């Protein structure tokens, strides 16, 4: 479950601006504010299924963009490369000192 939550957070961080205002709002309330589908539905006067549909469409849209661009995957690769460079720099500094 933790990996799913992380994945959803990364998708929203990278691609959230591509969503409609309604998709952003429902997605944020569900994943970040931890509101249930029923709570969101009650607040907006729509059905629980309506809220779920908006969130599922938002997830699908962001996943589709990631599947085409692989930006998040490349971000993680670069993070690993940066960590390796940082470790190498630390080792060099230790040798010099």
Spans of model-derived segments:
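C-terminal flanking helix
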Residues: 59-66
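Short alpha-helical "recognition helix" segments of helix-turn-helix
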Residues: 39-44
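Key DNA-contact positions within bacterial/archaeal DNA-binding proteins
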Residues: 49
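Residues within the DNA-recognition helix of helix-turn-helix
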Residues: 54-57
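Intrinsically disordered, low-complexity basic tails/linkers immediately adjacent to helix-turn-helix/homeobox/MYB/SANT
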Residues: 68-92
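Short amphipathic alpha-helical boundary/capping segments
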Residues: 10-19
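Short amphipathic alpha helix immediately N-terminal
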Residues: 21-32
């Amino acid at each position: 479950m933790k990996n799913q939550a992380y994945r959803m957070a990364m998708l929203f961080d990278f691609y959230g601006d591509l969503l409609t205002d309604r998709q952003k709002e429902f997605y944020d309330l569900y994943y970040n504010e931890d509101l249930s589908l029923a709570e969101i539905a009650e607040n907006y006067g729509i059905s629980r299924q309506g809220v779920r549909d908006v969130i599922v469409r938002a997830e699908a849209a962001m996943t589709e963009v990631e599947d085409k661009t692989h930006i998040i995957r490349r971000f993680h690769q670069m993070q690993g490369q940066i960590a390796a460079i940082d470790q190498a720099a630390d080792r060099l500094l230790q040798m010099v000192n």
